[in-house]
């Protein structure tokens, strides 16, 4: 019994010593990240979709900060994210990436053909924003409000029952071209 207590005390002291050494080393040899990269990464939507041409949001933030990459390549974040990054970096706002607009003129969402879905959950595992719900061997469905249209769920599907379709336009999602709407200013007289 005495040998067990000696072993426990020895392992505890070793753990304490190694913990102290690692704690000191982590502070002494810490590498500071670029605070601008951190702020840009916080602004990005963290969908890790790769539509910007980078494998995730962090590499894209590093490319913006260090390599001068365009700030308009985040399709899921859209114009709101681009404007926040432009404000942070004190640069002029840019129109959204022309290539992305040509490829996807409308907002796209994944749609599952539920009659052919076998419930394998591969699409759920591939979705970076958890927009697909369902259980194993049960029908899956996409929550269109959360779907970013990143296309990452389409390829893993073994039955090819997932497709991207444009979102139906509603008065809320319609892009009003205010330059083509005739506007006439009518002077109003104030009566005292």
From Swiss-Prot:
Keywords: 4Fe-4S, Cell inner membrane, Cell membrane, Electron transport, Iron, Iron-sulfur, Membrane, Metal-binding, Repeat, Translocase, Transport
PROSITE patterns noted in UniProt: 4FE4S, 4FE4S_FER_1, 4FE4S_FER_2
Cofactor info, note text: Binds 3 [4Fe-4S] clusters.
Pfam family, one: FeS
Localization (cell): Cell inner membrane
Origin superkingdom: Bacteria
GO cellular component, one term: plasma membrane
One BP annotation, GO: electron transport chain
EC number: 7.-.-.-
Residues that, per the record, bind [4Fe-4S] cluster 3: 127, 147, 150, 153
Residues reported in the UniProt entry to bind [4Fe-4S] cluster 1: 49, 52, 57, 74
4Fe-4S domain ranges (all copies): 32-91
Subunit structure: The complex is composed of six subunits: RsxA, RsxB, RsxC, RsxD, RsxE and RsxG.
Function: Part of a membrane-bound complex that couples electron transfer with translocation of ions across the membrane. Required to maintain the reduced state of SoxR.
Family the entry assigns: Belongs to the 4Fe4S bacterial-type ferredoxin family. RnfB subfamily.
Protein's name in the database: Ion-translocating oxidoreductase complex subunit B
Organism: Shigella dysenteriae serotype 1 (strain Sd197)
Gene: rsxB
